[in-house]
């Protein structure tokens, strides 16, 4: 066998082997993920049809207008029919791709109804970890998540340090978590099982390890799990602050109580720097050989008092928004939810206002640039 054939066989085998892998986005376990799979396959098939048509036309024209065929000159200066066709076809292609895509995007942002009894979970990113706070159940987990099957879960995405992206491929698409704001993202698991979630936005050394397990169980098993979680150690502020320190050696933890009792990350984006100071953690060159070198100077116990709830987000102060502090003995009631919704509405207005301001600046700049012509 020639060297070329050997290489061809080798690369062909590699291509076939790739089909043996479990592509998570093509193995959906929720309605949003199923919708995403449909869009992916629809787009691929649509593009393959277009490519096949182009290759067929290319072959036909290559043969028809070959040098040896003296009956066809191949010269054409104008043809209204053909020009209309190759204008209309791309428009049809764009419309055919846009309609299901736009429809899906609107479905993704649709909020669940009260009768659906959605479960609310605050998903907070910090220190290459994910903190999941259950405000109604008064429990918190680190790097693992348990949800009931067939029940919508409203994730309230927040970040306490770098911008990250919350993604559970088998349940749906990703959405960014950023400091100083809260982003809603609703997902539902239609099957029981364990799925993998991750941060899909590169944010440093621990990016590849910022993952979490998602356990989808029946409602009765979820209630049993909540009862067991409430028996765990209470999450106090000292423990939470130490967990905020960046580390690539993360563990799955469960606590009773939540960090919502003493900090609202959206209202107090500077909180994490105070936590660093309490444990003498200093940001250094991240490329250490071992985790011990990275955290060599970190204290076992804090040398400063716990920080009281504060508002350091200028937008909160400017728009009269309140910090969402929910004590471990306080109910996640309608009053709290109303204030929560109010803050979300205000953040949307701020976002829209920023877009309008940016657009007006661009328009003004274009006007000034065009004024001299």
UniProtKB/Swiss-Prot annotation:
Molecular functions per Gene Ontology: copper ion binding; cytochrome bo3 ubiquinol oxidase activity; cytochrome-c oxidase activity; oxidoreductase activity, acting on diphenols and related substances as donors, oxygen as acceptor
Stretches with biased composition (Basic and acidic residues): 292-320, 339-373
Lipid positions (S-diacylglycerol cysteine): 20
Coiled coil: none
Oxidoreductase is among the record's keywords: yes
PROSITE patterns, per database record: COX2_CUA, COX2_TM, PROKAR_LIPOPROTEIN
Chief location bin: membrane
Summary of the function given for this chain in its UniProt record: Catalyzes quinol oxidation with the concomitant reduction of oxygen to water. Subunit II transfers the electrons from a quinol to the binuclear center of the catalytic subunit I.
Membrane topology: Multi-pass membrane protein
Signal peptide: 1-19
The protein's name: Probable quinol oxidase subunit 2
SUPFAM superfamilies: Cupredoxins, Cytochrome c oxidase subunit II-like, transmembrane region
Residues lipid-modified (N-palmitoyl cysteine): 20
E.C. number(s) listed in UniProt: 1.10.3.-
Subcellular compartments: Cell membrane
Family assignment from sequence similarity: Belongs to the cytochrome c oxidase subunit 2 family.
